[in-house]
């Protein structure tokens, strides 16, 4: 995408706060996404910071000052304002103050997606770092699907996204900022979507915008004709600045970040107990609340008590502009807490923390990670073996596996019973066949029938009935039963048509076979 196709976003940045928020609201509601943010580029610090935003996601607890019913749009707009107010309250360490309004939000009132939106305020991105910084530097939109599945190197807010289930994030560059939209749905990259989002800001651009600064900026700007000229501002940091002296005049942005990195790393070593609050995929809101609220007094008191030595971790800035200087106001306590929140929480997930551990502890951590990886692989294998899985979490996989194993056990028991029954029938049939003996002799009109088979009730009567049907009249019968074996000797006379020996045997066998089938 060439630079000529990029919307002149400095017009948007120069619009009033409400108008900018209205544009963000229109853009995010038109696509039904969760939130929208405008990252404003600060030329003095060379960094993208929070400019404005609009939250369009789920709400856990609603608090409003309106006595009557409000529309959904009004409620969402008020929610975005309340989230920003809560962030400022937490930043100032006044979350427990009795002076707060009854309608003000508390950390426990927020959903995970609201926490994601709230914590975005604390982030900043020097181009080309982070998604917004990359989009701004490349002058091309950046689309990320599966933001909750990547690591922190790919997406710096990946831990937040995983907790809030933010799956898709897109950053669209403007000349003085970046528009970011996010959703809990997984959406494929769509160029028409990007063009549609740009159109909302393009259609509302003003031709003569007023100069504006982002909400993060604290510069006092003199309204002079020199404001329209482009001035290259060089800022350097002395060694005293890195030690915390507030008297330096020239500050380097790069060395400032290095200082914050060193100090936040040192602070981590003195607060190692807070690392346990932040496990992969854990509840991020609890961590941030603990960071800002669990020791607010000590944090602020430490900052104030050391003011004689270090007034603020963000030292006084003096920007050279010709012969004049514009001095920046500082807020030692608020900026100190903000710095702790910005730099301390990401380092809780930084892999470099393992380098500070003893060798034995490091080996234990590596072994534990490998054990978890193997356990996850086993769960994946187990999931592939179970034909039906209700959900993809470990508890559901185990539950479905147990149910499937019980089903297999029941099926095996049924098959074993069926096999035993069939085997018993085969054995019984073979026994009957081997024990069946029928001998028939017919001499003139005298008939002698000798037979042996398995006994059953009514067997003798059935045999006599068959002989009668063949025209053979029984004259004498001798029978015996021994261990379910039936033996009989029948003498008879042929009356009428003489039946053959084969016909008599066949008839007797039919009677016995009929008994076997029963």
From Swiss-Prot:
Keywords: Activator, Coiled coil, DNA-binding, Flavonoid biosynthesis, Nucleus, Transcription, Transcription regulation. Its main location: nucleus. SUPFAM superfamilies: HLH, helix-loop-helix DNA-binding domain. GO terms for molecular function: DNA-binding transcription factor activity; protein dimerization activity; transcription cis-regulatory region binding. One of its GO terms (cellular component) is nucleus. PROSITE patterns: BHLH. The keyword Cell division does not apply. GO terms for biological process: flavonoid biosynthetic process; jasmonic acid mediated signaling pathway; positive regulation of anthocyanin biosynthetic process; regulation of flavonoid biosynthetic process; regulation of proanthocyanidin biosynthetic process; seed coat development; seed development; trichome differentiation. Homodimer. Interacts with MYB4, MYB5, MYB6, MYB82, MYB113, MYB114, MYB75/PAP1, MYB90/PAP2, and TT2. Belongs to the bHLH protein family. This is Transcription factor TT8. It comes from Arabidopsis thaliana.
């Amino acid at each position: 995408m060439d630079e000529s196709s990029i919307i002149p976003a400095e017009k948007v940045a120069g619009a009033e706060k409400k108008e900018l928020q209205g544009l963000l609201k229109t853009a995010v509601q038109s696509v039904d996404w969760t939130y929208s943010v405008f990252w404003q580029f600060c030329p003095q610090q060379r960094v993208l910071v929070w400019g404005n935003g609009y939250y369009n996601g789920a709400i856990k607890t609603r608090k409003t000052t309106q006595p009557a019913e409000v529309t959904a749009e009004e409620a969402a707009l008020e929610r975005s304002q309340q989230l920003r107010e809560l962030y400022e309250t937490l930043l100032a360490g006044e979350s427990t103050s009795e002076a707060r309004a009854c309608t003000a939000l508390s950390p426990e009132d927020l959903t995970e997606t609201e926490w994601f939106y709230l914590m975005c305020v604390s982030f900043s991105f020097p181009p080309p770092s982070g998604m917004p910084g990359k989009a701004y530097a490349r002058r091309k939109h950046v689309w990320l699907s599966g933001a909750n599945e990547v690591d922190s190197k790919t997406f710096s807010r990946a831990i937040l996204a995983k907790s809030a289930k933010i799956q898709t994030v897109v950053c669209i560059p403007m000349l003085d900022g970046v528009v970011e939209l996010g959703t809990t749905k997984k959406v494929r990259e769509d160029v028409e979507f990007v063009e549609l989002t740009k159109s909302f800001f393009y259609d509302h651009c003003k031709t003569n915008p007023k100069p504006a600064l982002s909400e993060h900026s604290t510069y006092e700007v003199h309204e002079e004709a020199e404001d329209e000229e482009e001035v290259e501002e060089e800022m350097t940091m002395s060694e005293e600045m890195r030690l915390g002296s507030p008297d330096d005049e020239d500050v380097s942005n790069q060395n400032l970040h290095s200082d914050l990195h060193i100090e936040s790393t040192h602070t981590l070593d003195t607060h190692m107990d807070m690392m346990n609050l932040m496990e992969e995929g854990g509840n991020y809101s609890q961590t941030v609340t603990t960071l800002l609220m669990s020791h607010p007094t000590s944090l602020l008191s430490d900052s104030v008590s050391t003011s004689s030595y270090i007034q603020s971790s963000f030292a006084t800035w003096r920007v050279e502009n010709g012969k004049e200087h514009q001095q920046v106001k500082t807020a030692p306590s608020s900026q100190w807490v903000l710095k702790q929140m910005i730099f301390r929480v990401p380092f809780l997930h930084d892999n470099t923390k393992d380098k500070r551990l003893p060798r034995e502890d490091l080996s234990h951590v590596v072994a534990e990670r490998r054990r978890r990886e193997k356990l996850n692989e086993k769960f994946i294998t187990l999931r592939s073996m179970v034909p039906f899985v209700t959900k993809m979490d470990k508890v559901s996989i185990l539950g479905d596996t147990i149910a499937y194993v019980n089903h297999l056990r029941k099926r095996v028991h049924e098959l074993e019973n069926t096999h035993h029954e069939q085997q018993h029938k085969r054995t019984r049939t073979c026994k009957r066949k081997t024990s069946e003996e029928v001998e028939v002799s017919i001499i003139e009109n005298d008939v002698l029938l000798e037979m042996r088979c398995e006994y059953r009730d009514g067997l003798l009567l059935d045999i006599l009935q068959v002989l009668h049907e063949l025209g053979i009249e029984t004259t004498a019968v001798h029978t015996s039963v021994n261990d379910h074996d039936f033996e009989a000797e029948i003498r008879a006379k042929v009356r009428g048509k003489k039946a053959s020996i084969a016909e008599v045997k066949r008839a007797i066998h039919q009677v016995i076979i009929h008994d076997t089938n029963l």
